[in-house]
């Protein structure tokens, strides 16, 4: 009985622990995003689907770009002065929202032109950037709650998002909605309404601090942002190039990209969680972390291969057009994202050891390499899987180089024995 009680207590503790709640909440959010991606070919007409899925993919990408630097910066600095850095965080996030709303007011803004999401209607353009702003509301609120260890609040917020999105998908399917604005309003804005309330509450509660250290906070955040933007943009080069050549293939690539949402969310989740825990001054915690990541390797890659096999089989049988080609694109995307997620468990420590300048250089070289490959290798719809695989291999190679750089830096510091 005593053993049974201990086992039950341990399971209960694991299930209600901070990391478990965090993983569950973010997996649920990823599931809601994945369902939008997976069901949209079947609940939307072909023309509406190809337009929507490309824009939706870019909304998710813009969310990553605008949020990539601020949340890690907050998690790194929060432990030093909670009051001051909460103030800086909310101030910066407010500026981000203002920039997005401003972009929404200009149909011919350069960002839309680069991403090939320019609309003829001001209302459609505005609702795209409003969707990005509401999505970022969730990301920024989650970052603040993570710093405050309020994981139950994160879970409640994501359950609300999940339920509203499911209802929205049912209504879109049942009513055969084709209006672009209404679709985005249903799946990208209304589900995050509560996040706007949470943000306003945080702003009203914050104690405003002097801005004497805001420059250092901002510089660190800008460095992380540039690193993240380069990485995210590198992944988009092939998609944007494809959009200019073949809209159907661009839709297929956007669909494939949507399937890796759970890995991307898991990556963000793990990075956010561990950035708040890892400290360069604590040798034991760094060594323990590296040991855990190493032990995790075999099981992780076995699971990744199983998932890739299952996804290939499912897509091959359900995707409405060019199923074989789309299935292979999905597998390549999953492998690339899955491998980079694991490598990223090492490379995230560039922030812990302040190696951002070196990572910035590597990401810049990676961006340039992919740009050259995409620009000068003739595009062929017949060999799109091979071309996409080559681009993915280049990205993985540079991420490996960043991880290697981090491990070499740790070894050179002679803080951890045996590396």
Task: Please name every model-derived segment.
Residues 49-57, 125, 247-262, 327-330:
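Small-residue hotspots at the loop-to-helix junctions and early N-terminal turns
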Residues 37, 64-81, 260-284, 351-352:
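Helix-loop junctions and terminal segments of transmembrane helices
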Residues 77, 133-156, 335-362:
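Membrane-interface junctions at transmembrane-helix termini in multi-pass inner-membrane proteins
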Residues 46-47, 109-128, 310-344, 417:
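Interfacial segments at transmembrane-helix termini and the short loops linking adjacent helices
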Residues 17-29, 55-109, 123-125, 283-308:
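Membrane-water interface segments that mark the loop-to-transmembrane alpha-helix transition
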Residues 18-33, 37, 160-161, 183-202, ...:
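Transmembrane helical elements of multi-pass membrane transporters/channels
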Residues 126, 155-204, 365-369, 381-408:
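Hydrophobic alpha-helical transmembrane segments
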Residues 2-14, 117-123, 152-156, 176-188, ...:
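Interhelical loop/hinge segments that connect adjacent transmembrane helices in multipass membrane
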């Amino acid at each position: 009985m005593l053993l049974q009680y201990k086992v039950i207590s341990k399971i209960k503790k694991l299930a209600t622990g901070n990391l478990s709640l965090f993983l569950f909440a973010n997996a649920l959010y990823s599931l809601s995003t994945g369902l939008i991606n997976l069901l949209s070919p079947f609940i939307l007409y072909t023309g509406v689907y190809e337009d929507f899925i490309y824009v939706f993919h870019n909304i998710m990408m813009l969310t990553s770009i605008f949020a990539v630097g601020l949340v890690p910066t907050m998690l790194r600095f929060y432990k030093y002065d909670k009051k001051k850095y909460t103030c800086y965080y909310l101030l910066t996030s407010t500026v981000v929202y203002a920039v997005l709303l401003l972009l929404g007011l200009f149909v011919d803004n350069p960002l839309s032109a680069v991403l090939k999401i320019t609309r003829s209607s001001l209302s459609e353009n505005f609702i795209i950037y409003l969707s990005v702003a509401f999505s970022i509301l969730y990301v920024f609120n989650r970052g603040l709650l993570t710093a405050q260890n309020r994981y139950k609040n994160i879970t409640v917020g994501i359950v609300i998002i999940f339920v509203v999105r499911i209802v929205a998908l049912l209504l879109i399917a049942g009513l055969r909605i084709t209006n672009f604005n209404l679709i985005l309003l249903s799946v990208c804005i209304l589900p995050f309404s509560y996040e706007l309330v949470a943000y306003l509450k945080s702003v009203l509660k914050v104690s405003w601090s002097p801005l004497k250290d805001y420059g250092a906070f901002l510089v660190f955040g800008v460095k992380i942002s540039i690193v993240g933007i380069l990485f995210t943009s590198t992944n988009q080069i092939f998609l944007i190039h494809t959009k200019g050549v073949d809209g159907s293939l661009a839709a297929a690539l956007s669909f494939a990209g949507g399937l890796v949402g759970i890995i991307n969310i898991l990556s963000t989740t793990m990075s956010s969680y561990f950035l708040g825990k890892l400290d360069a001054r604590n040798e034991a915690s760094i060594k323990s972390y590296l040991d855990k990541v190493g032990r995790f390797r075999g099981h992780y890659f076995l699971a990744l291969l199983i998932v890739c096999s299952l996804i290939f089989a499912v897509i091959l049988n359900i995707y409405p057009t060019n199923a074989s080609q789309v299935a292979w694109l999905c597998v390549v995307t999953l492998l690339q994202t899955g491998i980079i997620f694991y490598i990223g468990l090492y490379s995230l420590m560039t922030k812990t050891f302040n190696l951002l300048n070196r990572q910035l250089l590597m990401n810049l070289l990676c961006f340039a390499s992919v740009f050259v490959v995409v620009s000068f290798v003739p595009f062929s719809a017949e060999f799109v899987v091979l071309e996409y695989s080559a681009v993915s291999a280049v990205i993985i190679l540079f991420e490996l180089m960043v991880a290697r750089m981090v491990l070499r830096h740790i070894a050179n510091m002679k803080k951890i024995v045996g590396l």
